[in-house]
């Protein structure tokens, strides 16, 4: 398997055709997996926002004040409001805001980016990353006559470990996971619980070569990845009612009476 960055992608602006930009910079193949940073998808969709466009609610004011008190970190109430607007549910309000986006991703600050956003204060995540992955895949087929798989990616922190890693927000052309259950290990024991989050692992591999900051590039290609003869699943996010961690967070508060 080979993973390489797509170099030379220009600064993306609202209305740009992401698929066309990628095809111009990379000789793509049918079996490739194209990993595209959510930032350029959002830029192309005009998801940049100004803080001045947000009028903070009472809840946003309270959350911002609580974060400032607990974390000794100034939090603009308008930023808190932007996060609330992008969340279906807020699980933690302080010392940071952890929420469930409207497409099911759980992340800090609703994944809102404040870096590399020319002409705006904030960059929101795509509204429907899977639909965007499908559109990019269709566009690549239209422009280049090939049909690789596409993953829209982001970087995200994780509990219990330091550091960020690449994750999949949306995907098209491949299953989210592959199921090893029913197969056997080297000692002949049947595997009972091994479901591999393929799209997340590919997103993380892509993140190793795309980099961060002003030296980064917003796309990478995974070539010669073999999914194998396994059952696949489109489900990546846990069922909220069976997610023990989510249920615990719903009951937990940093602020004690």
Curated annotation (Swiss-Prot):
The lineage of its organism: Archaea, Methanobacteriati, Methanobacteriota, Stenosarchaea group, Halobacteria. InterPro entries: F420-0_g-glutamyl_ligase, F420-0_gamma-glut_ligase-dom, F420_ligase_CofE_arc. Its cofactor is Mg(2+); Mn(2+); K(+). Homodimer. GTP binds at residues 9-12, 38-39, 43, 116, 210-217. Binds 2 divalent metal cations per subunit. The ions could be magnesium and/or manganese. It comes from Haloarcula marismortui (strain ATCC 43049 / DSM 3752 / JCM 8966 / VKM B-1809) (Halobacterium marismortui). Pfam families: F420_ligase (PF01996). A divalent metal cation 2 binds at residues 155, 212. Belongs to the CofE family. Keywords: GTP-binding, Ligase, Magnesium, Manganese, Metal-binding, Nucleotide-binding, Potassium. Catalyzes the GTP-dependent successive addition of two or more gamma-linked L-glutamates to the L-lactyl phosphodiester of 7,8-didemethyl-8-hydroxy-5-deazariboflavin (F420-0) to form coenzyme F420-0-glutamyl-glutamate (F420-2) or polyglutamated F420 derivatives. Pathway: Cofactor biosynthesis; coenzyme F420 biosynthesis. NCBIfam families: F420_cofE (TIGR01916), PRK13293.1 (NF009809). SUPFAM superfamilies: CofE-like. It catalyses: oxidized coenzyme F420-0 + GTP + L-glutamate = oxidized coenzyme F420-1 + GDP + phosphate + H(+); oxidized coenzyme F420-1 + GTP + L-glutamate = oxidized coenzyme F420-2 + GDP + phosphate + H(+). This is Coenzyme F420:L-glutamate ligase. One of its GO terms (biological process) is F420-0 metabolic process. Its EC number is 6.3.2.31, 6.3.2.34. One of its GO terms (molecular function) is coenzyme F420-0:L-glutamate ligase activity. A divalent metal cation 1 binds at residues 113, 154.
């Amino acid at each position: 398997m080979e993973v390489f960055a797509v170099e030379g992608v220009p600064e993306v602006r609202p209305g740009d055709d992401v698929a066309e930009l990628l095809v111009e910079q990379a000789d793509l193949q049918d079996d490739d997996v194209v990993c595209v940073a959510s930032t350029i998808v959002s830029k192309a969709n005009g998801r940049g926002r100004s803080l001045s466009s947000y009028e903070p609610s009472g809840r946003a004011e309270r959350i911002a004040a609580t974060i400032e008190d607990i974390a000794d970190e100034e939090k603009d109430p308008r930023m808190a409001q932007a996060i609330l607007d992008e969340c279906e549910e807020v699980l933690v309000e302080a010392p940071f805001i952890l929420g469930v986006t409207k497409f099911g991703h759980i992340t800090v600050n609703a994944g809102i980016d404040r870096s590399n956003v020319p002409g705006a204060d904030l960059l929101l995540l795509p509204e429907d990353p899977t639909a965007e992955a499908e559109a990019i895949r269709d566009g690549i087929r239209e422009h280049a006559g090939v049909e690789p798989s596409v993953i829209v990616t982001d970087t995200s922190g994780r509990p219990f470990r330091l550091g960020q890693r690449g994750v999949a927000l949306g995907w098209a052309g491949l299953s989210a996971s592959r199921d090893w259950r029913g197969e056997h290990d080297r000692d002949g024991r049947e595997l009972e619980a091994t479901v591999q989050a393929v799209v997340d692992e590919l997103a993380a591999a892509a993140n190793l070569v795309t980099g961060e900051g002003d030296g980064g590039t917003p796309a990478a290609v995974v070539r010669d990845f073999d999914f194998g003869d396994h059952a696949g699943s489109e489900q990546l996010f846990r069922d909220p009612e069976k997610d023990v961690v989510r249920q615990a967070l719903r009951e937990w508060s940093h602020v004690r009476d």
